């Protein structure tokens, strides 16, 4: 988009000079000087406690009238988004890049997720009073800058006209842990946002962070010490270790049910099938749909593309080795502009938003955008598949079954998870096949059970959230569980579709732990699969892989039943897990089908 935008700055005109005497026409092309937005550096925005935040403000060249103001509120240093600011300043908006408290050139100290709500309120109201603003203020951004929009909204600044949160992180859901399981990435992110500078090179050094994660993993160290292992001891990291569940510490950072009920402004939520913050984005969306007024919900639109985290702002045709059609690459700058025009300038609603939910279907050579009035109305059939086996389901060659009729018999499937084993993690570090990889399934080392459907008789659209219900018994009081679903193409190639995780002690509630009673058969419901939309090809099969994760990418559970972040190899207990699927214990996978 940048290249197109630069070309667009030059206006080429042809001047016709008519000579009456010679009747000759001469064409001349004169390139006009590029129209560059005006910029104000080091603008100081006062907060209620006296701290001053730093902003860089971009305005349309020689701005002639007050306009709506867009701002990005970021810990990643405002300069990172200069290209966006230039774009919107060229399209009729004032744009402010604002460093959050304690980052960049802003005063104060940065503590993630703590100050942005009230600070953001003050930013909105200060911008609204500036002579270049017409009283309407909005926000742009994703990830942390998506979270910012929701936390500012819960303060209800009078001049906030709309928000467009993309890939919005949700404290207590997908950050700093995901469903109560931490990972080394949180320390990488804390290093990225340490001090006042960008730290982009260090943050992006995959070799360094991979080596540190592997060191923690191979040496069986306590996760609570990972910040020291990584070289950046962090008080925030330690505070998070003391808050391992979604409690009041995280609740105060996000809207409450009462807050959702008072929302009135238009909202456009953006996420992707492979967005790491998809759980957060959907948590905000679903809670607004649950608690919001009917009028407000009519003004909340949702876009779900075949995108990863970065793709929710700059879509690409390829993600993790999968390639998508040209239509998947939306011009999100253009869409944002149209949305802002509609919400703040009285323009037309973006033509792309034909209904309140837009999602992109991939697969089976028939990709396209589709629409629905609500998230729930996308699918019109639930297909229930029953897990079964002859007692052997530990490999892709001797797997269990997923069938629409429950298989006869009462065989069980068993696997073993030894937290002292490091072969899976060591192999994972060399795996660069992304969403097409089968390494973890093919080399599960006896840790997991695998089930396949029969080949699909016709191409079938599966869109939405899967639900897995399984009955397990184990000989440890806690372990971690993961369920992954793949499409296995007729060629034998694999495509990752969705996954879900669970720490066994939180099987009944994410807020309260209940250790497992060893030897007792209990129900485990995985209802936190990520959203996806795929047309499964004729001849393809679905594969379900249930196992205990053993990876450098997550905090390791040593199965002792103690505080997981404090466990080391000395606490390790091998887990023997049994999956039961008989008439009294129906283990099922539910698929949302679109017909």
Locate each region found by the language model.
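Glycine/threonine-rich phosphate-binding loop and adjacent beta-strand/alpha-helix elements that clamp
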Residues: 30, 296, 325, 331-332, ...
